[in-house]
UniProtKB/Swiss-Prot annotation:
It comes from Homo sapiens (Human). CDD domains: bHLH-PAS_NCoA3_SRC3, PAS. Residues 1-38, 408-493, 501-520, 537-674, 709-730, 755-798, 912-945, 1273-1321 are annotated as: Disordered. Widely expressed. High expression in heart, skeletal muscle, pancreas and placenta. Low expression in brain, and very low in lung, liver and kidney. The keyword Acetylation applies. Acetylated by CREBBP. Acetylation occurs in the RID domain, and disrupts the interaction with nuclear receptors and regulates its function. Keywords: Acetylation, Activator, Acyltransferase, Cytoplasm, Methylation, Nucleus, Phosphoprotein, Repeat, Transcription, Transcription regulation, Transferase. One of its GO terms (cellular component) is nucleus. Coactivator activity on nuclear receptors and NF-kappa-B pathways is enhanced by various hormones, and the TNF cytokine, respectively. TNF stimulation probably enhances phosphorylation, which in turn activates coactivator function. In contrast, acetylation by CREBBP apparently suppresses coactivation of target genes by disrupting its association with nuclear receptors. Binds to CSNK1D. This is Nuclear receptor coactivator 3. Transmembrane segments: none annotated. A motif (LXXLL motif 2) lies at residues 738-742. Residues 449-467, 550-568, 579-588, 709-727 have a biased composition (Polar residues).
């Protein structure tokens, strides 16, 4: 019967009673009783079933009415089971109560059990509550810490813990209780956890020892391994007091255990008897294949040489003990890596005796390293971290640290380098840089300096002046170029160069002395640059610890010597001695720098620095830096003992550091020439550093220049060249070189004088690599330089050219135009053919250059920029210009160098490109870049300069002209030549011209000082462009020379022109202009002059002020467009490209350029005239025709896209722009923009119309603008028929207007062309140019058209800048557009045309406007 049935029984029985009444009363009673019993039985069984089913989940049969029997059976089973379990439990209890139970009395007495256990554990027991107080400690603590039990009980555990271990200990303490309930979340932490901590030992005070020891030194810590149990169950049961405690057993860690029980890392250092590092052997670390070994070595050495880290030992005491006992062992110490990893280290040293004489020879120290993977120590090595300041301030500490790598390197090459000197402390710091006593100079230590003079490789260390004291260094650091690494934007460094180049700058001082020190130093410098240590170069130098490594100057100069010894070894000086050691030491001072540097190196494609282990990469970098320095005349640097060993190396090291080295060498060898060269170099370096403002830009440029720069570098040293190339960190090296040069500028004179004899000796050695400009050794090295420079050139062959070439071959001038060396990604290609030129130029220019450099010194910021721009016209125009302009607005403006740098649009490199490599080269040939040409022109107006010109790079170098040879027209033939070509204003237009092609980049650099800078740029640019065009047409700049033959022809023409113009003074140039009919052309562009004047009145000052901060490159962009226009004239395709490039550059720079467009416009007048003249002179009508054709073609192509105007500039610019833009990290942007422009040009009309419609919605004048655009399209087609004129006139107008057009390129970038400009002006820029010119002249055209057109452009490219700029420009545009020659007369109008071109970039009809604007040369009037 089922339970359910039973449940129903009562009901059933009731019904039965009613239905079946008993017949008899007795039966009725019996029947009812049975029923009740059954009902009750059913109820109980039902309840039982419920209990069973509730307790048993396996009774499935109960789901269906189980019968009573089944329920009872299951119940019985369960009851039995329960009883059995009870019996088992009782039996267990009995067992627990047995005699053997742990709860019973044991064989071992409880009192003795604890001590025995502790003895077996070799530790002591202590209990700490959650507040950190010791509530119990075992008596045997005395055996370990010398404290008595009562001394520690109820005291804070933190009193005996090392401050660095307190946080780790705190993590293991139980959490505080909440509402009396402790460890709510700690129940799972019952397992023991192990950690290490240092506990203070109570040591008896030794009176004598205490007197001489600091309180920290009196403290001795014992490293203990603690096994902690936070919440034992037993403790919980006993009470709450212990529940919140942590029970620890601390045991002593044996020395073997301390020093990395398994697979320890280690490296060996060799020290002289004074403890200075002589050599660093990192083979074991390298073999470990662990990442960041350079950083760990650097930091370990820093820590080892730093003040005691609260321990009772110091490096000095350690070696004293080793000296007395023959061996010594340090306690375990810790330091942290850049990534925060804690490293435990221990150093064991043995006294090394001469096996023959048994005399004490030195110490061999083995550093055991163990990385702690568990837990992060926020400041595991505060002392180590503090080492940097101590290293900077503490010679011994720093020396020891930096010295160890250097000495290791130096010692092999020559202990004389200060390794053995008492002043080696400073030297050791220097060693960090170069592996020689160079650091001594760096570190403020008399000993250091004395070794530096003694060593000559200390020249880098001559930075007795605080490395940080020289702001110039930081700006010039390739850090900027590299950077993305760059810790601080190079822009910061830009002003740093402002101090007299090299006066404070360790680079200049270092340039004179430490050459081999450079290798290690160069690595640091490169690292610093990579990290973006804008100003840290000096600080690096001053701080032997972290920053010392970064000192580019040290890296640059010293490595040249070091590399001379071992060109392959970045520690050239150390050669086989473990370049890594020096690099590591350097890294120690700059761990971050090294890391960043490695990153940037990889970014640059120069992982070689860090990738191949800094030993290899650094070697290459050092070699490059050294070689360049040598090329630049730094061979003198090798004058010291290092000199002989480094002669060959120096040659191979020419490239990255070659420029700087040769520059330094030149300074040393020809102190007088170098004095001026150094000043000029210093400024150039500053500008270069400024130019390489952003680490990203630097990184891109470096990446681009990596292969290319190396090519130029290779010319110096074949084997080393390759390495140098691999060291695409050339930028870094360049920065180092720049820094070095900067430091050397002022100190250079003194150092030059001091080192001059040495330099002469070194010169011979260095000249091999760089055909140093030093007269004595320049020719000697010339053949090698020739080897480096694809083109020939005796050392004499234009020291200017040699210097320029040097710069080119150097990082700054990876290519002839590689003044941006690192930036020259594209330029390198363009100038690869002319690399030889770069090297040779460097040499040639070097000798000639020093005097001129002095002159240019005044323009030093420009000089820096200009010289590099000469080299790197195309590749870095944008980048260099930005930094230079932004960093040195005035420099750009006032300084011809800047102009030259600007002027060398293709030389833009001069301004910016050089920063990377040329900058260092420039320092020597600061004017060299700009001046080298000028110097060449002056000294060798025809031959030297021609030599340079044949060298494509030198052509780019012509930006030397932008140096504003105009200040010295006669003295600067090239500049004059270009000025004549730009004759409108030899002084101003050259800058405009030069700036225009790449001036935009330059302008960007000059951002801050756009007004003056623009003129300077334009003026210099003109001269420079001529030359750069010769060296590298826009085509070359855009990519590897697109047409070598065409370039050769252009170069030949430019050479001839250069020779002619170089030999003619301003008057002669004017006569030539008249003969060419340039004055007439200028008269045609009278409107331009008024505009220029007006704009000049406004000058870039307003625009620059508006955009100076925002658009460093933007402003230059506008300036360049004018130059671009001029280039169009001067060099039909090249200049056309240049102009376009300028415009594009301008466009690119135009990101913040539109206001500057206005600024440029004032200058447009002169630049226009100069461009017209230059075009006519250089290219004649052919160039004009070519320019016209190019413009027409480009305009036609863009007609589809709104970048018609932009197109003309853009397409050529695309080529050139790719070069310099790529170099400026805008390479990709420029490419994308170019491709985008091409597409947009095809769709430009569509886009422009759409944009116009959109802008019409936004602006009431859009309808008018559309009409104007239609007219413009018609007129542009007409105007484009005379694109040459347009080109010429736009060249002139474009200098001003062109910059406006470059505004469009900014649009390519995030900013609209209007960005930073009045919206109305923006339209003016957008469309005002060609379409609005006619209409603008008659109407409000400029403003309306620009408004309408630009909106189109803006809509397509939507660059806010454009809008901002046009308002200023619109006023001018409208006022000028009214003039008959809107394009010619109105830079604004032409600017508008360029803006249209810009807009074209932006996708407007600019293409059409561009042609119109281009026409204005001839069709200016028709434009209206």
């Amino acid at each position: 019967m089922s339970g359910l049935g039973e449940n129903l029984d009562p009901l059933a029985s009731d019904s039965r009673k009613r239905k079946l009444p008993c017949d008899t009363p007795g039966q009725g009673l019996t029947c009812s009783g049975e029923k009740r019993r059954r009902e009750q039985e059913s109820k109980y069984i039902e309840e039982l079933a419920e209990l069973i089913s509730a307790n048993l989940s396996d009774i499935d049969n109960f789901n269906v009415k189980p019968d009573k029997c089944a329920i009872l059976k299951e119940t019985v089973r369960q009851i039995r089971q329960i009883k059995e379990q009870g019996k088992t439990i009782s039996n267990d209890d009995d067992v627990q109560k047995a005699d053997v139970s742990s709860t019973g009395q044991g064989v071992i007495d409880k009192d003795s059990l604890g001590p025995l256990l502790l003895q077996a554990l070799d530790g002591f027991l202590f209990v700490v509550n959650r507040d950190g107080n010791i509530v119990f400690v075992s008596e045997n603590v005395t055996q370990y810490l010398q404290y008595k039990q009562e001394d520690l009980v109820n005291t804070s555990v933190y009193n005996i813990l090392h401050e660095e271990d307190r946080k780790d200990f705190l993590k293991n303490l139980p959490k505080s209780t909440v509402n009396g309930v402790s460890w709510t979340n700690e129940t799972q932490r019952q397992k023991s956890h192990t950690f290490n901590c240092r506990m203070l030992m109570k040591t008896p005070h030794d009176i004598l020892e205490d007197i001489n020891a600091s309180p920290e030194m009196r403290q001795r810590y014992e490293t203990m391994q603690c096994f902690a149990l936070s919440q034992p169950r037993a403790m919980m049961e006993e009470g709450e007091d212990l529940q919140s405690c942590m029970i620890c057993v601390a045991r002593r860690i044996t020395t073997g255990e301390r020093t990395f029980p398994s697979n320890p890392e280690s490296f060996i250092t060799r020290h002289d008897l004074s403890g200075k590092v002589v050599n660093i052997d990192t083979n074991s670390l390298r073999s470990s294949m662990r990442p960041g070994f350079e950083d760990i070595i650097r930091r370990c050495i820093q820590r080892f040489f730093s003040l005691n880290d609260g321990q009772s030992w110091s490096q000095k005491r350690h070696y004293q003990e080793a000296y007395l006992n023959g061996h010594a062992e340090t306690p375990v110490y810790r330091f942290s890596l850049a990534d925060g990893t804690i490293v435990t280290a221990q150093t064991k040293s043995k006294l090394f005796r001469n096996p023959v004489t048994n005399d004490r020879h030195g110490f061999v120290s083995t550093h055991f390293l163990q990385r702690e993977q568990n837990g992060y120590r926020p400041n595991p090595n505060p002392v180590g971290q503090g080492i940097r300041p101590p290293m900077a301030g503490c010679n011994s500490s720093v020396g020891g640290m930096s010295m160890s790598p250097n000495q290791g390197l130096q010692m092999p090459s020559s202990r004389a380098y200060g390794l053995a000197d008492p002043s080696t402390t400073g030297q050791m710091s220097g060693a960090r840089y170069g592996g020689s006593s160079n650091i001594a100079s760096l570190t403020p230590g008399p000993g250091m300096q004395s070794p530096s003079s003694y060593q000559n490789n200390n020249y880098g260390l001559n930075m007795s002046s605080p490395p940080h004291g020289s702001p110039g260094l930081a700006p010039n650091q390739q850090n900027i170029m590299i950077s993305p690494r760059n810790r601080g934007s190079p822009k910061i460094a830009s002003h740093q160069f402002s101090p007299v180049a090299g006066v404070h700058s360790p680079m200049a001082s270092s340039g004179n002395t430490g050459n081999h020190s450079f290798s290690s130093s160069s690595l640091s410098a490169l690292q610093a640059i990579s990290e973006g240590v804008g100003t840290s170069l000096l600080s690096t130098l001053s701080s032997p610890g972290p920053k010392l490594d970064n000192s580019p100057n040290m890296n640059i100069t010293q490595p040249s010597k070091v590399s001379n010894q071992d060109s392959k070894s970045p520690l050239g000086f150390y050669c086989d001695q473990n370049p890594v050691e020096s690099s590591m030491c350097q890294s120690n001072s700059r761990d971050h720098l090294s890391d960043k540097e490695s990153k940037e190196s990889s970014v640059e494609g120069a992982e070689n620095q860090r990738g191949p282990l800094e030993s290899k990469g650094h070697k290459k970098l050092l070699q490059l830096l050294t070689c360049s320095s040598d090329d630049r005349g730094h061979s003198s640097l090798t004058n010291s003992p290092l000199d002989s060993s480094c002669k060959e190396s120096s040659v191979s090291v020419t490239s990255p550091s070659g420029v700087s080295s040769s520059t330094s060498g030149g300074v040393s060898s020809t102190s007088n020439m170098h004095g001026s060269l150094l000043q000029e170099k210093h400024r150039i370096l500053h500008k270069l550093l400024q130019n390489g403002n952003s680490p990203a830009e630097v990184a891109k440029i470096t990446a681009e220049a990596t292969g290319k720069d190396t090519s130029s570098i290779t010319s110096c040293g074949d084997g080393n060249v390759v390495k140098q190339e691999q060291l695409s960190p050339k930028k870094k090296e360049n920065n180092a070189l720049l820094r070095y040069l900067l430091d050397r500028d002022d100190p250079s004179d003194a150092l030059s004088k001091e080192l001059q004899p040495q330099v002469e000796g070194v010169d011979n050695k260095m000249s091999q690599c760089t055909s140093s400009t030093i007269p004595s050794s320049s020719q000697e090295k010339d053949p090698k330089i020739k080897t480096e420079t694809s083109e020939e050139g005796s050392g004499d062959l234009d020291n200017l050219d040699a210097i320029l070439g040097d710069l080119t071959s150097s990082d700054f001038y990876n290519n002839s135009i590689s003044s941006n060396g690192s930036h020259l990604g594209t330029k390198q290609q363009v100038f690869q053919g002319t690399n030889s030129l770069g090297l040779k130029s460097s040499q040639s220019v070097q000798s000639i250059r020093p005097p001129y450099n002095r002159a240019v010194s005044l323009d030093s910021p420009v000089s820096v920029g200009s010289s590099p721009p000469v080299k790197n016209i195309s590749a870095f125009p944008m980048l260099p210009k930005q930094p230079m302009l932004g960093g040195n607005p005035r420099m750009m403006d006032s300084q011809e160098n800047y102009g030259s740098s600007m002027g060398g649009p293709n030389r833009n490199v001069t301004v910016t490109q050089t920063p990377s490599s040329g900058d260092w080269g420039l320092p020597n040939s600061k004017a060299g870049r700009m001046e080298p040409m000028n110097s060449n022109s002056m000294g060798r107006p025809g031959g030297d300069y021609n030599t340079s010109l044949p060298r494509p790079a030198l052509g780019g170098s012509i930006p030397t002209l932008p140096l504003r040879s105009n200040s010295i027209p006669g003295a600067r033939p090239v500049l004059q030549q270009q000025q004549q070509m730009l004759q409108m204003r030899p002084g101003e237009i050259p800058m405009g011209m030069g700036a225009n092609p790449y001036g935009q980049a330059a302008a960007s650099n000059q951002l801050g000082s756009w007004p003056d800078g623009m003129l300077s740029m334009e003026q210099v640019s003109h001269g420079t462009q001529n030359r750069p065009l010769l060296r590298n047409s826009l085509d070359d700049l855009v990519g590897p020379p697109s047409n070598l033959e065409g370039q050769s022809d252009e170069r030949a023409l430019l050479d001839q022109l250069h020779t002619l113009l170089s030999n003619t003074d301003a008057t002669g140039l004017e006569e030539i202009d008249r003969a060419l009919g340039i004055p007439e052309l200028v008269n045609q562009g009278q409107a331009l002059e008024p505009k220029q004047d007006a704009f000049q009145g406004q000058e870039a000052a307003v625009m620059m002020d508006q955009k100076a901060g925002l658009y460093g490159q933007t402003y230059p962009a506008q300036g360049p467009p004018m130059q671009g226009g001029f280039h169009l004239q001067g060099q039909s395709p090249s200049f056309n490209s240049m102009m376009n490039q300028m415009n594009q550059q301008g466009n690119f720079p135009l990101q913040g350029m539109h206001p500057r467009a206005n600024i440029m416009r004032p200058r447009t007048n002169t630049p226009k005239q100069l461009r017209m003249q230059l075009q006519q002179r250089l290219q004649g009508q052919q160039f004009l025709n070519q320019s016209r054709q190019a413009l027409e073609l480009k305009m036609e192509n863009p007609t589809a896209g709104g970048a018609a105007v932009m197109r003309p500039m853009m397409q050529p610019q695309v080529s050139s722009q790719q070069g310099f833009l790529n170099a400026q990290m805008v390479a990709q942007r420029s490419r994308e923009l170019l491709s985008h422009h091409f597409r947009q040009q095809r769709v430009a009309m569509m886009m422009q119309q759409q944009q116009q419609q959109q802008q019409q919605q936004q602006q009431q004048q859009q309808q008018q603008q559309q009409q104007q655009q239609q007219q413009q399209q018609q007129q542009q087609t007409q105007a484009f028929s005379p694109p040459p004129n347009v080109t010429a006139s736009p060249s002139m107008d474009g200098l001003l207007a062109g910059p406006t057009m470059p505004q469009a390129p900014p649009q390519q970038f995030p900013y609209q062309p209007n960005y930073g400009m009045g919206q109305q002006p923006d339209p003016a820029f957008g469309r005002v140019s060609s379409p609005p010119n006619a209409m603008m002249s008659s109407r409000m055209g400029p403003s309306q058209n620009p408004m309408m057109q630009h909106p189109q452009a803006a809509s397509i490219y939507q660059s806010s800048e454009m809008k901002g700029w046009p308002s200023g420009n619109l006023a001018r545009n409208s006022s000028f557009s009214q003039q008959q020659f809107a394009h010619q007369g109105n830079p604004a109008v032409y600017s508008m045309v360029h803006m249209n071109g810009s807009s074209g970039h932006m996708g407007q009809m600019n293409m059409n406007p561009m042609p119109m604007s281009g026409m204005p040369m001839g069709p200016d009037q028709k434009y209206c």
